[in-house]
Each structure stands twice: as structure tokens, then as C-alpha cells.
Regions:
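Short, glycine-/aromatic-enriched active-site segment of Class I SAM-dependent methyltransferases
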Residues: 147-169
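Short alpha-helix
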Residues: 166-186
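Conserved acidic residues
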Residues: 46, 112, 138
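Class I SAM-dependent methyltransferase SAM/SAH-binding core
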Residues: 47-104
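Conserved beta-strand signature within the Rossmann-like core of class I S-adenosyl-L-methionine
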Residues: 136-151
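Class I SAM-dependent methyltransferase Rossmann-like catalytic core
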Residues: 1-43
Length: 215
């Protein structure tokens, strides 16, 4: 990506992004909401971080009795403002942080659980490794998209124009390579779960736990 340009995600309007993700032919927003309910409940963590939080989809499943702090991280300031507006009921628990994960991973606070859904595709393995290590997370739960046609990784929709620049930052993420990248930094895979989507794509959830001998 040209260093003089801002990140494409800073230009995508949240309403267009969410409208695209909610289409009957896409249904990723709905699928992600149900996945995040499971992610928040899966492990004995009282602090969590959602990387690429966007408009806060899935945060309705955060239970105040379980979590002391949940950090929502995104590069788009407007997304974070909307998230804070939507989840006033999580006041005192939810913290929204504008951080460029590729260049500013050192700004991330600690968290026991890191959730990264459809995020690694836009920062790559190396930046994700740095982010995870910075948080010192015990558990990492990720979702990546499996594409039947890798040349069409954004589903057709009336909002397709909004995503024109994403090719600049998109990486095709593979399960084996992600598992290897996590092993490099001391994490072992503990869960694999696939959720089919209506457009021939699928969401693959991969969870990892920090190796005791590396912490």
C-alpha cells in the first residue's frame, strides 16, 4: 500500500459495510454475531480485545458479570464512535481504541482473550503475530473467510463499490499458514469450526491457546 494513502478501511462508510454484510446473499454480520456469542463465553477470561471491531457487531453478548474490560480496536475513528454510541450499556467495561495494527501494535493493552474476525486478511500474518504478542493473550479466537473463488473474495452486492480499494491491503489467509504463524509465537490450535454462508463461502473459526512453556 502506498504510504501516502490512508488505509482503505478509513474510507468505507459503516452503513454501507454493514448493509453489505447483512444482505441475504452474504449474511456475514448475522453469522458473526452468533460466532461472537460463543467466542465471548468459550474461555475463562475476564478481559478481552476485539481487533477490527467495526460497528461493534457481537458486543451485545458481552456479560458484565464475566468481563471487567473489553477493548474494541479499529483504525476507523468513525466506527469506534458508533460502537460507543450503540453500547452505552457497557459503560465502564467497553474501551474503544483507534490503533493502526500494522504500524502501532505496541499501543495495544494486555488482554486474556483476543478475538480477530475477518481481520487477519487485512493486516497479514506478521502484523497479527505482533499484535497477539503485545497483548500477552492466553486465548486467541479468529475467524477467516474460505473462498470458493479467490478472485472474488468480496461477495457481489449493490455496495461493492465501497470496497474498491481493499485489494491494496487484502491477504489471502490459509488455515495451515495461520496455524504455523501462531505456532511460531507459542500458540497451539485448540478448536476448528466451520460455518457455511449462503454464497458458497464459509467462515472458519480457529482458536489457539498459549503454550505454558512459552509464557
Amino acid at each position: 500500500m502506498n504510504e501516502n494513502k490512508n488505509n482503505p478501511w478509513e474510507e468505507i462508510a459503516l452503513d454501507e459495510y454493514e448493509a453489505h454484510m447483512s444482505l441475504d446473499s452474504v449474511k456475514q454480520l448475522q453469522a458473526m454475531d452468533s460466532i461472537m456469542k460463543e467466542q465471548f463465553e468459550a474461555y475463562p477470561a475476564d478481559t478481552a480485545m476485539v481487533l477490527g471491531v467495526a460497528g461493534g457487531n457481537g458486543l451485545r453478548h458481552v456479560r458484565r458479570e464475566k468481563y471487567r474490560t473489553v477493548c474494541g480496536v479499529d483504525i476507523n475513528e468513525g466506527y469506534l464512535r458508533k460502537t460507543a454510541e450503540r453500547y452505552t450499556g457497557l459503560s465502564g467495561v467497553l474501551e474503544c481504541l483507534r490503533i493502526d495494527l500494522i504500524n502501532e501494535a505496541e499501543k495495544l493493552p494486555a488482554a486474556k482473550l483476543v478475538i480477530a474476525n475477518l481481520l487477519i486478511e487485512y493486516i497479514g500474518y506478521d502484523a497479527f503475530q505482533r499484535a497477539v504478542l503485545q497483548t500477552g493473550a492466553e486465548y486467541v479466537s479468529c475467524v477467516i473467510q474460505i473462498n470458493t473463488d479467490e478472485s472474488k473474495w468480496v461477495s457481489d452486492s449493490p455496495y461493492l463499490h465501497a470496497f474498491d480499494r481493499l485489494d491494496e491491503v487484502h491477504h489471502q489467509i490459509e488455515e495451515t499458514a495461520l496455524t504455523a504463524a501462531m505456532a511460531e509465537i507459542g500458540y497451539t490450535g485448540i478448536l476448528q469450526k466451520t460455518k457455511p454462508l449462503p454464497n458458497g463461502k464459509a467462515l472458519l473459526r480457529l482458536d489457539f491457546k498459549a503454550d505454558r512453556n512459552t509464557r
